[in-house]
């Protein structure tokens, strides 16, 4: 008889204690629940994005496979057409009609020859092959090319060669140090010309006099 009221008292006391504990921890329970809810929503979004990406990847793979298959088909068609062209035995199949009378034959030359060279034309009426080549300027060997030397007359105002005397009749300009003077008077202001002494010049004059005397003696003999 005593056990029944004891059990009821313990049950009531336990429920009250549990309710009190839950009341105290209600804030923590709410925060945990909210955090779990947020985590679940994020997981759902990640799963949905992964599923969409997987679908897009499968679509892109299928598109790539379709593109590759289309390229292979085009290559097969090109190979077939090339084989048909190569297997063609008739030479007329590879000719190009320029107009009604002339037929242009396929060029067997190198690409550089075709750029700088000629084109072969076949005339159907005369059955003759004529090569039309680009005109080039050729200098004949008989033609003489004037060379710029000392004898050529040039405009002194436009003399470009400092080593050539374009005016032999007049005295050379002092501004050009590379042209030798015709007389024996050497300029002192020109550092490039060799300065001869008076003894050297007198010696040259004496040599000329001796040469004149010897020539006169020889003529008398």
Swiss-Prot record:
Keywords, in A-Z order: Host cell membrane, Host membrane, Host-virus interaction, Membrane, Phosphoprotein, Transmembrane, Transmembrane helix
Ranges facing Cytoplasmic side: 23-221
Topology in the lipid bilayer: Single-pass membrane protein
Biological processes annotated in GO: actin-dependent intracellular transport of virus; symbiont-mediated cell-to-cell migration in host; viral release from host cell
Residue ranges, Extracellular side: 1
Primary subcellular site in the record, as a coarse category: host cell
Source taxon at top rank: Viruses
Family label: Belongs to the orthopoxvirus A36 protein family.
Protein name: Protein OPG164
Organism: Vaccinia virus (strain Western Reserve)
């Amino acid at each position: 008889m005593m056990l029944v009221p004891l059990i009821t008292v313990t049950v009531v006391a336990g429920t009250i204690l549990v309710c009190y504990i839950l009341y105290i921890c209600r804030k923590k329970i709410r925060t945990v629940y909210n955090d779990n809810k947020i985590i679940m929503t994020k997981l759902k979004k990640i799963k949905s994005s992964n599923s969409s990406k997987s679908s897009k990847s499968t679509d892109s793979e299928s598109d790539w496979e379709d593109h590759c298959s289309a390229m292979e088909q085009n290559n097969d068609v090109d190979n077939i057409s090339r084989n048909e062209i190569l297997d063609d035995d008739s030479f007329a199949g590879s000719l190009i009609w320029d107009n009604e009378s002339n037929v242009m034959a396929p060029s067997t030359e190198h690409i550089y020859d075709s750029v700088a060279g000629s084109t072969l034309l076949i005339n159907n009426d005369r059955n003759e092959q004529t090569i039309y080549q680009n005109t080039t300027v050729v200098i004949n060997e008989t033609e003489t090319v004037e060379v710029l030397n000392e004898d050529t007359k040039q405009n002194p105002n436009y003399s470009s060669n400092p080593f050539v005397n374009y005016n032999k009749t007049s005295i050379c300009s002092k501004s050009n140090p590379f042209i030798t003077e015709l007389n024996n008077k050497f300029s002192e202001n020109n550092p490039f010309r060799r300065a001869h002494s008076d003894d050297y010049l007198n010696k040259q004059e004496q040599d000329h006099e001796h040469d004149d005397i010897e020539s006169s003696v020889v003529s008398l003999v």
